[in-house]
Amino acid sequence: MTAPAATQEETDGPPRSLVAGARAIVMARDPAEKVRLARSTARAWRERTLSLGALSVEHGMPDRPGRPDRPVLLPPRDMPRRSSHGARGRIALLHSLAHIELNAVDMTWDLVGRFAREPMPRSFFDDWVGVGHEEAEHFALVSRRLAELGAGYGDLPAHDGLWQAAQATGHSLIARIAIVPLVLEARGLDVSPAMITSLEAAGDQASAAVLGVIYRDEMRHVAHGAKWFRFLAERDGQAPEPLFQSLVRQNFRGPIKPPFNDRARAEAGLTPGFYKPLVAVGRFS
């Protein structure tokens, strides 16, 4: 099932509300349009020219985001194995990263729109609008680097596993925060330094610089996740660490496995007591 097309009213000009802007971003099929809408919506929110707004029966968040015709989306198990060496390997790495960032755009703006009904401080939306804007800029950065290498997003197949995390947590804000920033983005903190080192060793300083920007921003995204997870847990009178572990066991479809970048995670507020008890434990492991 594909996302319904956004209306012209939703995509032309400034959004009527933050929720309307978030919905239009998720529904847009063209990645460049997602980036444009994310920029304009984030700017309007920062300038305090948008109300929060609300979803309605007729205008709810879609079950699936808008997507271009390419790349072909495959189940993760059907993805072809690719060499990590040479120019083709770097293009494959960047293409995979572009796909991750496009999903991050949709997952973040879906969080903003879907959970606007929650009684949260305005600073909560300030943080996640900022994250949504940065995810869009990450996609744009990686796309430009792919173009410099003679490639583009859509040239290779991609897997459809990431959006499943959004679908699995659409019922719960605290579950969404547990899985997306505190599992998926935290994993980026684990793997990015080695990828940056590998690109530098291959002489691809430009691609390494792109990953460096993303890595630094991911630290902030995980920090936002840790802050708001604690806020929600403590508001409900629950201890954050065991609650996190329970939510991951219920809602995440894979193992939590080392190696971990413990220092970066801790700097972002995600201390080992959250994730070490989950090592090699997954919903279907």
Protein language model features and the residues they cover:
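Non-heme di-metal
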Residues: 2-285
